[in-house]
């Protein structure tokens, strides 16, 4: 959890926002997946948001569902994902690593055991996409016992009650949703979200990162101008992986070309 605090403090000092890419672990296979993560960090990623493949990803649009299918085709298991997370942490000791996943994968292990494993491999946060705030107690309590930040989604239509709960229970960062629906770069982020950002700040919530539909530098800049601490981009990155699936070197070059201007847009 402390890695998020020190990241946001450093960025504030440098007058920058955070750029956070999302990818699915082991898409399209373990070696290339590790190279992808190294490339994202070299190109300027401030933190990582990583998906553990799940057979029924409700919040994901077709792009990320395809990434999940590719990972399954490569024979992915949650145990292998944790081995991979340990490797990433070893190589990148200071970058915050967040997991974005579904409740079944947490239950499979046993809630406490799952978060214990996260702590062991150096995961900083976990967002369980299909667990609403009001049902989150066993997850967030286990997370905090193991020094893992529980992350909550703040939807664009959040009422005051929900905003207070998110502020009270969340740690690390707050996932500020650009719009309702499933993930996807095709549906551009709807702005502005100034009123939500102001309320979250008022209630002392963890810094908001805006996600869903973030696919261009102007959207990153707009999110930060609206008061967000940064932006998360997933489908646009996963699409690049898909487009260059048979050209691993081209894929890495294209990812670099995408991430550099996205990071540059966080600088005021």
UniProtKB/Swiss-Prot annotation:
The active site is at residues 49, 60. GO terms for molecular function: tryptophan synthase activity. One of its GO terms (cellular component) is cytosol. Its EC number is 4.2.1.20. InterPro entries: Aldolase_TIM, RibuloseP-bd_barrel, Trp_synthase_alpha_AS, Trp_synthase_suA. It holds the Pfam family Trp_syntA. NCBIfam families: trpA. Belongs to the TrpA family. This is Tryptophan synthase alpha chain. It comes from Shigella boydii serotype 4 (strain Sb227). The gene is trpA.
């Amino acid at each position: 959890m402390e890695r998020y605090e020190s990241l946001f403090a450093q960025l504030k000092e440098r007058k920058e926002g955070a750029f956070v890419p999302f990818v699915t672990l082991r898409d399209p296979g373990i070696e290339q997946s590790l190279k992808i993560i190294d490339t994202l960090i070299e190109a300027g990623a401030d933190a990582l948001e990583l998906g553990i493949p799940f057979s029924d990803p409700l919040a994901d649009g077709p792009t990320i569902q395809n990434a999940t299918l590719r990972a399954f085709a490569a024979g992915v298991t949650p145990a292998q994902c944790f081995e991979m997370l340990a490797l990433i942490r070893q190589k990148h000791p200071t970058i915050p690593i967040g997991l974005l996943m579904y409740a079944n994968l947490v239950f499979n292990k046993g809630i406490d055991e799952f978060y214990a494993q996260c702590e062991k491999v150096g995961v900083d946060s976990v967002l369980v996409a299909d667990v609403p705030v009001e049902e989150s107690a066993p997850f967030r309590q286990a997370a905090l016992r193991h020094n893992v930040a529980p992350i909550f989604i703040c939807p664009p239509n959040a009422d005051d009650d929900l905003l207070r709960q998110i502020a009270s229970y969340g740690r690390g960062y707050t996932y500020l949703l650009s719009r309702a629906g499933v993930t996807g770069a095709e549906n551009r982020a709807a702005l502005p979200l100034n009123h939500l950002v102001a309320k979250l700040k008022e209630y002392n919530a963890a810094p908001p990162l805006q996600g869903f539909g973030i696919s261009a530098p102007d959207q990153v800049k707009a999110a930060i101008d609206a008061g967000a601490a940064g932006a998360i981009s997933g489908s646009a990155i996963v699409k690049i992986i898909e487009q260059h699936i048979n050209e691993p070197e081209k894929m890495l070059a294209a990812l670099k070309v995408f991430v550099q201007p996205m990071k540059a847009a966080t600088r005021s």
